[in-house]
């Protein structure tokens, strides 16, 4: 049997419990066709880069699969039919990663960071400050509307 990583994007207007039920449904399809499901990671509701079927956000779920190709094909066929599934991607891998995926570790790193590694802004919120005299420029020309001519 081959090893696969499968990422599923579900609609934003269903609940997390419904997403978990979807994953359980597809786990049942895989197991009925002789496959096994390893790690299941829920990445939660995340913004999409662009709209997919009028959705701006989606529930992301990663599933590690050890199954024959026919079982994966049947799962993908059922996902195409389901309206709650926006997108999915199945990739064959040599071995599954141990521990958390890169998406979850990045989120944890972001939570631990205090923000002290960023430079402090000066008062007023602008970082350029006063630019001083621009001696390389001549005197300013009057604008057309300042000279009395209308546009």
From Swiss-Prot:
InterPro entries on file: Ribosomal_bS6, Ribosomal_bS6_sf, Ribosomal_S6_plastid/chlpt, Transl_elong_EF1B/ribsomal_bS6
Endpoints of the signal sequence: none
NCBIfam families in the record: S6
CDD domains for this protein: bS6
Purpose of the protein: Binds together with bS18 to 16S ribosomal RNA.
Annotated region (Disordered), positions in chain: 96-151
Keywords linked to the UniProt accession: Ribonucleoprotein, Ribosomal protein, RNA-binding, rRNA-binding
Gene3D superfamilies: 3.30.70.60
Family statement drawn from the similarity comment of this UniProt entry: Belongs to the bacterial ribosomal protein bS6 family.
Protein name: Small ribosomal subunit protein bS6
The organism of origin for this protein: Brucella anthropi (strain ATCC 49188 / DSM 6882 / CCUG 24695 / JCM 21032 / LMG 3331 / NBRC 15819 / NCTC 12168 / Alc 37) (Ochrobactrum anthropi)
GO cellular component terms, A-Z: cytosolic small ribosomal subunit
BP terms from Gene Ontology: translation
Superkingdom, taxonomy of origin: Bacteria
One Pfam family cited in the UniProt record for this chain: Ribosomal_S6
């Amino acid at each position: 049997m081959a090893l696969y990583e499968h990422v599923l994007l579900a609609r934003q207007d269903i609940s997390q419990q419904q997403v978990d039920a979807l994953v359980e449904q597809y786990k049942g399809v895989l197991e009925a066709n002789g496959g096994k499901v390893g790690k299941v990671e829920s990445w939660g509701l995340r913004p999409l880069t662009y709209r997919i079927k009028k959705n701006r956000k989606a529930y992301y779920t990663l599933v590690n699969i050890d199954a024959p190709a026919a079982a994966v094909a049947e799962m993908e066929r059922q996902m195409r039919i389901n309206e709650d599934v926006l997108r999915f991607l199945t990739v064959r891998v040599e071995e599954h990663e141990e521990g958390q995926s890169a998406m979850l570790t990045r989120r944890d790193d972001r939570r631990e960071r205090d923000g002290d590694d960023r430079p402090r802004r000066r008062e007023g919120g602008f970082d350029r400050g006063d630019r001083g005299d621009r001696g390389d420029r001549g005197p300013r020309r009057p604008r057309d509307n300042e000279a009395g001519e209308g546009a």
